[in-house]
């Protein structure tokens, strides 16, 4: 996803309030844990993108930020919403540097749910864990990990270890945890 961002001057409340009134989202770009730049993202463009995004996929979406004539690859590290309107009011981006490890949550997508043996026998498919915490290089980031549930029978489970994890991605969480189960109704 490409975003054109502008620089912003200060962190004063009055300036940030004015940015939001003019249809912008104040944001901070970090690199190596340190603040690199204060920026502004177009609220309409970002909200439109969010509405098309699958649930949980924002954490593994790589953004290309056009900032002061250069392209910066970044991940959204934090997002703040308005309490009542649920509009995005602030973003934190983390710059992706080639060769430097990045920690992120990658969503787990169940495939072949319609053909699942346990569901055909009247069971209910329940996804217990929706994402997995991993460490990888920026070039190895994938939008999601697939878990095939076709052969899953009644009262059976699949663990995180059953996910085919691509080379270059190292899970941080325990792979012994249950990811998906088919429960009797």
Swiss-Prot record:
UniProt keyword annotation of RNA-binding present: yes
Keywords of this entry: Ribonucleoprotein, Ribosomal protein, RNA-binding, rRNA-binding
Chain segments annotated as coiled-coil in the UniProt record: none
GO cellular component: cytosolic large ribosomal subunit
Top-level taxon of origin: Bacteria
Pfam families documented for this protein: Ribosomal_L25p (PF01386), Ribosomal_TL5_C (PF14693)
GO molecular function, one term: structural constituent of ribosome
Xref: Gene3D superfamilies: Ribosomal protein L25, beta domain, Ribosomal Protein L25, Chain P
InterPro entries: Rbsml_bL25/Gln-tRNA_synth_N, Ribosomal_bL25/Gln-tRNA_synth, Ribosomal_bL25_b-dom, Ribosomal_bL25_C, Ribosomal_bL25_long, Ribosomal_L25_dom, Ribosomal_uL5_bac-type
UniProt record, GO biological process: translation
Subunit structure: Part of the 50S ribosomal subunit; part of the 5S rRNA/L5/L18/L25 subcomplex. Contacts the 5S rRNA. Binds to the 5S rRNA independently of L5 and L18.
Function of the molecule: This is one of the proteins that binds to the 5S RNA in the ribosome where it forms part of the central protuberance.
Family statement drawn from the similarity comment of this UniProt entry: Belongs to the bacterial ribosomal protein bL25 family. CTC subfamily.
UniProt protein name: Large ribosomal subunit protein bL25
Upper lineage: Bacteria, Pseudomonadati, Chlamydiota, Chlamydiia, Chlamydiales
GN (gene name): rplY
